[in-house]
Every structure is written in structure tokens, then in C-alpha cells.
Amino acid sequence: MWHLRCSNWRGSGVFGMCFSLSGCVMGQWCVSRAIVRGHTQGGAVREVVRELLLGPQHHGYARLVDPAVRPLSCFSRGDTLYIDLPVGVLSPKYRTCSLHRAYELXERSVVLNCAPVKRVCFYVGGRAGFESDG
């Protein structure tokens, strides 16, 4: 298994990213690679969050959240990323992993891909959900 960080190849606007995903069988997880075109390094955090919320391309992995979920807000201050998800994330219409597992995998993916981010704080409907120790 190899890891790509959010790196720009030869100034082409092409970025490689790694995402941590939860397997549908026995709670396993793996790392999936993705190549994203046309995004700047500064927009990498938003792009990682967007890709995570879209879910995996392979049906053998559980979605982190319902595919219709869009963050109410997503911003960073210093080395911390704040993501506020709507209350609907608590009652998904599709098979997803638990919210705590979604948080763990999202945090791992964001920290791996976006070097300045060291902590992730999840909010649900504006209320604190999960946050890392940093």
C-alpha cells in the first residue's frame, strides 16, 4: 500500500489524494487513491471533504454519510478543520458506517492529504459531535 499526499504534479493542476474507507465486511478499512484535476492546493481541504462525502466508487466499501448530505459549513482555522453536517446525517437513508467511524476515517483522510490540518472537529446541526486531540 502506498500513500499520495495532496501534491501537484508538474504544475498541471492534477492532485493525488488518499482516502481511508470502511469495508462493508467485518469493519475492515483500507486506503483508496484518487486523482483530482483542476483544483488548487489551497482548495485541497474542501476537495477532500467533498470527495469523502460523495463516497467510495467501489460498492464493497461503506459510505461515510448519506450521498445527499452537504456540509452546512466547512472551514479551517490554524491547524483545525471544522465541518458542520446537517442533522439528517443521524438518520441516513442508505447504508453508512457509524457516525463515529465516519469521523475517524474522515479525520485520517483529511490529516493525510492536507498537511496544515492536524485536527478535525465534526458538528451536527451546529452542535459539537466529535473532535480530535490533535
UniProtKB/Swiss-Prot annotation:
Residue positions bearing lipid (S-diacylglycerol cysteine): C24
Spell out the protein name for this chain. Uncharacterized lipoprotein TP_0248
Per the record's keyword annotation, is Lipoprotein included, yes or no? yes
Where does the signal peptide begin and end? Answer: 1-23
Compartments reported by the entry: Cell membrane
Instruction: Tell me how this protein sits in the membrane.
Output: Lipid-anchor
Sites of N-palmitoyl cysteine lipid linkage?
A: C24
Give the superkingdom in one word: Bacteria
Q: Which organism is it from?
A: Treponema pallidum (strain Nichols)
On whether Lipoprotein is a keyword of this UniProt record, the answer is: yes
What keywords tag this UniProt record? Cell membrane, Lipoprotein, Membrane, Palmitate, Signal
Any one GO cellular component localisation term in the record: plasma membrane
- Source lineage: Bacteria, Pseudomonadati, Spirochaetota, Spirochaetia, Spirochaetales
